[in-house]
């Protein structure tokens, strides 16, 4: 597949925050070949420190890190540099997490594994082009699961409150969550 040409702009600074070191190094090398100047961090604390000290024009942040959530890095960067283009990566692709990422300031959201071409396209897109419609739309069961997950996250993972909001018994919700939870 041919690489697309994108215009990086005057500031090619890029912060990559991911606790998967081999992926982090591979992505940094690939982004450097594309003209970015990557700076790497493996923790929320390190990512926030870089975002505060030297706010980059671009950022790629993993959602779940060992010491917390990447959304904290997104918030810090958005405060320090409102025009930054931020892409959130996650191995746990769900509508609820995508919505949360965009609400705190991410410009795009990609599920892992995402290659450097996908990341570059997301960072440099102008946001006007709509993504193509899915080839296989979600089933009704999947839509239900996504809705339950979204409400569960809104309730800070409180099962009793989530069950109340969804008008279902707490034990029913616990069974659903246990049955579908990633192992």
From Swiss-Prot:
Post-translational modification: Phosphorylated by RegB.
SUPFAM superfamilies with a match to the protein in the record: CheY-like
Residue span, Response regulatory domain: 13-127
UniProtKB keywords: Activator, DNA-binding, Phosphoprotein, Transcription, Transcription regulation, Two-component regulatory system
Keyword Transcription regulation attached: yes
Signal peptide positions on this chain: none
GO terms (BP aspect): phosphorelay signal transduction system
Chain positions with 4-aspartylphosphate modification: 62
InterPro entries, per database record: ActR_PrrA_rreg, Bact_response_regulator, CheY-like_superfamily, HTH_Fis, Sig_transdc_resp-reg_receiver
Top-rank taxon, per record: Bacteria
Molecular functions per Gene Ontology: sequence-specific DNA binding
PROSITE patterns: RESPONSE_REGULATORY
Function as written in the Swiss-Prot or TrEMBL entry: Member of the two-component regulatory system RegB/RegA. Involved in transactivating anaerobic expression of the photosynthetic apparatus. It is a transcriptional regulator that is responsible for activating expression of the puf, puh, and puc operons in response to a decrease in oxygen tension.
Protein name, as recorded: Photosynthetic apparatus regulatory protein RegA
Taxonomic source organism: Rhodovulum sulfidophilum
């Amino acid at each position: 597949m041919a690489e697309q040409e994108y215009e990086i702009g005057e500031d090619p600074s890029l912060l990559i925050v991911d606790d998967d070191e081999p992926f982090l190094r591979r992505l940094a090398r690939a982004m450097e070949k594309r003209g970015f100047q990557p700076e790497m961090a493996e923790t929320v604390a390190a990512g926030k420190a870089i975002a505060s000290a030297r706010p980059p024009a671009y950022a790629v942040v993993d959602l779940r890190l060992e010491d917390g959530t990447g959304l904290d890095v997104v918030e810090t960067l958005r405060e320090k540099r409102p025009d930054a283009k931020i892409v959130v990566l996650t191995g746990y692709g769900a509508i609820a997490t995508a919505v949360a990422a965009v609400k705190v300031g991410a410009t795009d959201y990609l599920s892992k594994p995402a290659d450097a071409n996908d990341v570059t396209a997301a960072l440099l897109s102008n946001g006007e082009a709509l993504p193509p419609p899915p080839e296989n739309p979600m089933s009704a069961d999947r839509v239900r699961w996504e809705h339950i997950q979204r409400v569960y996250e809104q309730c800070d993972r409180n099962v009793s409150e989530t069950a109340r909001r969804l008008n279902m018994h707490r034990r029913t919700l616990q069974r659903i969550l246990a049955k579908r939870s990633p192992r």
